[in-house]
Design a protein with these regions (language model features):
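Acidic/negatively charged segments and metal-coordination signatures
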Residues: 1-45
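Active-site cores enriched in adjacent His and Asp/Glu residues with nearby glycine-rich loops
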Residues: 62-130, 179-218, 233-241, 249-257
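A conserved acidic, glycine/proline-rich C-terminal tail/linker
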Residues: 248-271
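Acidic, low-complexity central loop/insert segments
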Residues: 129, 153-165
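Single conserved hydrophobic/aromatic residue that forms the stacking wall/gate
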Residues: 274, 278-283
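Short, charged beta-turn/beta-strand-edge "cap" motif at the junction between a beta-strand
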Residues: 139-143, 246-250
Length: 283
């Protein structure tokens, strides 16, 4: 329950402005949505201008690292080399790799190759070869602010099937971004992504989705890609979250690697993940 604030009191967002000149009308609008039965965000996941600026600075490091990998990833490279690049570049720019030691995760990045859905472990034994597709999932902490993004890369000449699913998955993300509008719903994003995937003969992983980002690595809300249009949480200015659907060639089912309890594989052949180049900012 939010504490009642006087109209002339400092706003809860930390802006220093009076509540009546800052978030009073905003809160009244959220209250109207809530009274109609909509799921509305709590204040702790709504970022102020200072926080958004800090998160964007973290994003700059994250994007720079992914840009460098994009220019230098190649056939014959092992994924442990990618992990070293991420650690060295991130720390040299004053950041911290967010995955490193997060809930016991032992690397600075996730490198998921071919049928790995996500959370692939970098390894000297995983050597990239022509025809591979790889997702590099990079996350950065800078001055306490978190960013999270990944990119898909194709190695050498890939099959038409691989090229097609990479293209369609990117289209899914772009459609999801277009659907993410203030005072819309998370379900609008899901509908845009799931519809396009299914129209092209693909499935969307249901149990794994996007998440809030910024002050912690994983925040509310959970961003599903299979819920109906107009459902789930209302999107309001100041929310920040990732849009990172996992699109499968076969069924949406997956299993977790029993050896490391992290890496997730598709139950049949072929799975890709693609995310936006930075968290979606609804400011």
């Amino acid at each position: 329950m939010s504490v009642k604030i006087g109209r002339n009191d400092p706003c809860w967002c930390g802006s220093g402005r009076k509540y009546k000149a800052c978030h009073e009308a905003f809160d009244e609008k959220i209250a109207r949505y809530a009274s109609q039965g909509h799921i509305v965000p709590q204040r702790n996941i709504i970022k102020n201008a200072e926080q958004i600026a800090g998160i964007k600075e973290s994003c700059k490091i994250n994007i720079a690292v992914l840009d460098y990998i994009e220019k230098n990833i190649h056939e014959g490279m092992n994924t442990a080399e990618i992990d070293k690049i991420v650690y060295d570049m991130t720390t040299s720019m004053g950041g911290i790799p967010a995955p490193l030691n997060y809930e016991g995760y032992p690397f600075s990045v996730c490198t998921s190759v071919n049928d790995q859905v996500c959370h692939g472990f970098p390894s000297k034994d995983v050597i990239l070869k022509a025809g591979d597709i790889i997702n590099v999932d990079c996350s950065t902490i800078l001055n306490g602010y978190f960013s999270d993004a990944s990119r898909m890369f194709t190695i050498g000449e890939v099959s038409p099937e691989a090229e097609r699913i990479v293209r369609v998955t990117k289209e899914c993300v772009e459609l999801g971004l277009k659907a993410a509008k203030p005072w819309g719903h998370l379900g609008d994003i899901a509908y845009a992504i799931n519809s396009h995937a299914q129209e092209n003969g693909y499935s969307v992983v249901e149990e794994i989705g996007g998440h809030g980002i910024g002050l912690e690595f994983h925040e509310e809300p959970f961003v599903s890609y299979v819920t109906p249009k107009g459902s789930e949480m209302v999107l309001v200015p100041g929310m920040m979250f990732t849009i990172e659907p996992m699109i499968n060639e076969g069924s949406p089912d997956f299993f977790v690697d029993e050896d490391n309890d992290w890496t997730i594989y598709t139950m049949d052949d072929g799975c890709l993940l693609y995310t936006s180049p930075s968290p979606r900012d609804l400011s």
